[in-house]
Regions:
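Extended aliphatic helical segments
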Residues: 1, 20, 27-30, 35, ...
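Phosphate-handling catalytic interfaces
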Residues: 1-109, 113-119, 123
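Basic, glycine-rich
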Residues: 71-72, 99, 127-134, 141-145, ...
């Protein structure tokens, strides 16, 4: 449990809770089920400052996806009396994007950024004869490479599959990927899974094989 303490100017980690310092600053709060909590922007910055870069970006993307304002997040960040972690979170706010649809996509974007790749187009739609045939997570137009994060939920979770079996979902995904590969200008497709985007994973190898300019020295996924 994280608690915001207006009497503290330094963080404190206890066995069952973390105390976030709030001395000298106004803390915006809201009531949720009768419990006073910090508002969305304040909470997001509190968590981002105390998290590694991967988890922080997941939080920031989620807030933007829910309608949060980047300028409000930045203003809250810059208002903090401590400078520890501010530069790191400021850089993540430049990378964060509300079009990211899942935690896995957030981590994939961070990994590609850390590998020095150009910023991809997000949620790019491919159309043939005026009909959208696919919307992909990441598109690198100069390299002609599509990157998808495959969280595997679509194959396992019934609420995602609907009435389809896992086998039917796999077949549909195969047809979809074939259609994307057939689009003029698409020269490669890479699928990243969870273990590849985690530190020490094989994301650099998968991305390099697709045709993206990943440095040869990058053999495993960087630490966030």
């Amino acid at each position: 449990v994280a608690l915001t303490d207006p009497t503290r100017d330094r963080a404190q980690r206890l066995r069952f809770s973390d105390k976030v310092p709030a001395r000298g600053r106004d803390v915006a709060t809201v009531l949720i089920d009768g419990v006073e909590t910090t508002d969305l922007v304040t909470t997001a910055i509190d968590v981002a400052l105390r998290s590694d870069r991967g988890h922080a970006l997941v939080i920031l993307d989620a807030v933007l996806r829910r309608g949060g304002d980047r300028h409000d997040l930045l203003a809250e960040l810059e208002s903090r009396p401590t400078r520890r972690g501010v530069q790191r979170v400021r850089a993540l706010l430049e990378l964060a994007d509300g079009r990211i649809e899942s935690a896995g996509e957030s981590l994939a974007l961070l990994v590609m950024h850390d590998l020095g790749l150009p910023r991809p187009e997000l949620q790019h739609e491919f159309s043939v004869d005026g009909r959208c045939i696919a919307r992909v997570d990441f598109w690198f137009p100069e390299q002609g490479v599509v990157v998808e994060f495959d969280g595997l939920v679509k194959y396992r979770a019934g609420e995602v599959r609907g009435a389809r079996t896992a086998e039917e979902v796999v077949i549909a995904e195969k047809f979809r990927e074939d259609a994307v590969r057939a689009v003029p200008g698409v020269r490669g497709v890479a699928r990243l899974i969870w273990r590849e985007v985690l530190p020490g994973g094989d994301a650099p190898i998968t991305l390099r094989r697709s045709g993206l300019p990943v440095p040869l020295a990058s053999r495993t996924t960087p630490t966030w």
